[in-house]
């Protein structure tokens, strides 16, 4: 019996949508749990080049051996599906996404959409050509905190936002490809915060200036730290400071947000608090209710987009703007100059 991940119910549809999950080891393993808990999706096949990861995921969720495959081509030839969930390293995103789309499957893909803007645009173009849904799982904006901050700004309670400072400090001990990246924080993590910025301020970026570095104690090959200054099209400015080798105090994965507005301010760090000008009192805001949250909401939004034949909130086309922020940051870090984000779109 599949159970919901949140106290509020969602509309349960009679027929589950069928999903092939490509990549079930590492982070993909946690996705198998979320898919298995969904009342909207049914995993009909697992695909992974790592035989041990495949066996472990199959054993955990009673996936029959004849529905476990080492390549997507074999899975497509053996099972019928509505969509593919892609949880593999970014360098093979385009290959797997194009293969899925050409087979007529809708695609939900982990961020980043692709390893280059050119490859990301190819995936978006293929989905558009075939009238299939392409969604990037930017799950950080699907959390109650982010939803609550945006609602608070939209109410006008604290006035118009002017600038924000976002701090992110973690020390994850990853294995695999992230350790070998030149810019692991920017490529694999900051896109979550960049996308959340676009969502919260309901605006797109215009220019970016970035510096990155590698502390002596870092266990990453590349630069795991960055400072990014962002100007949005609506005039809001942001300063983002991030680290994946923080040995002192850590933030949540969402980060610590301080937003200065014309009538007060907002502080989001687990809880969302507001404070009006000339007031000694701060108010803890009530979270926006959501039927599901995080990656469970990604699956819900993806299913809704397919069922209702509409674009998902974090469609591939929309996500190009978040991905462009990453590549503009990378260019700025290399050149030492401010970079226009639109040049990547």
For the regions a protein language model found, what residue spans apply to each?
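Active-site loop of classical SDR/Rossmann-like NAD(P)-dependent oxidoreductases
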Residues: 30, 49, 53, 288-299
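Predominantly a Rossmann-like dinucleotide-binding segment in NAD(P)-dependent oxidoreductases
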Residues: 27, 140-220, 336
């Amino acid at each position: 019996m599949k159970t919901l991940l949140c106290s509020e119910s969602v509309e349960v549809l009679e027929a589950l949508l069928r999903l092939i999950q490509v990549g079930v080891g590492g982070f993909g393993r946690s996705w198998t749990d979320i898919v298995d808990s969904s009342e909207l999706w049914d995993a009909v096949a697992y695909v992974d080049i790592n035989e041990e990861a495949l066996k472990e995921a199959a054993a955990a969720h009673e996936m029959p051996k004849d529905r476990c495959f080492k390549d997507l081509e074999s899975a497509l030839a053996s099972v019928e599906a509505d969509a593919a969930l892609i949880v593999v390293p970014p360098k093979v995103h385009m290959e797997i996404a194009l293969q899925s789309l050409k087979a007529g499957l809708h695609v939900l893909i982990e961020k980043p959409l692709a390893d280059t803007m050119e490859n990301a645009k190819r995936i978006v173009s293929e989905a558009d050509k075939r009238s299939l849904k392409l969604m990037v799982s930017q799950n950080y904006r699907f959390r109650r905190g982010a939803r609550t901050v945006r609602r608070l700004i939209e109410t006008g309670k604290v006035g118009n936002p002017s600038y924000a400072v976002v701090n992110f400090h973690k020390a994850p001990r990853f294995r695999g490809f992230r350790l070998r990246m030149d810019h692991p924080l920017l490529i694999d993590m900051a896109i979550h915060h960049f996308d959340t910025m676009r969502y919260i301020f309901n605006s797109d970026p215009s220019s970016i200036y970035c510096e990155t570095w590698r502390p002596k104690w870092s266990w990453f090959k590349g630069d795991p730290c960055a400072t990014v200054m962002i100007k949005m099209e609506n005039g809001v400015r942001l300063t983002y400071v991030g680290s994946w080798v923080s040995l002192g105090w850590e933030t949540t994965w969402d980060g610590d947000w301080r937003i200065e507005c014309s009538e007060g301010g907002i502080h989001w760090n687990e809880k969302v608090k507001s404070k009006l000008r000339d007031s000694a009192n701060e108010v803890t805001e009530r979270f926006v209710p959501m039927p599901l949250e995080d990656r469970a909401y990604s699956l819900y939004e993806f299913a809704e987009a397919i069922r209702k034949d509409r674009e998902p909130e974090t469609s591939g086309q929309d996500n190009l703007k978040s991905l462009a922020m990453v590549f503009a940051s990378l260019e700025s870090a290399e050149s030492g100059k401010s970079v226009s984000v639109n040049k990547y779109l």
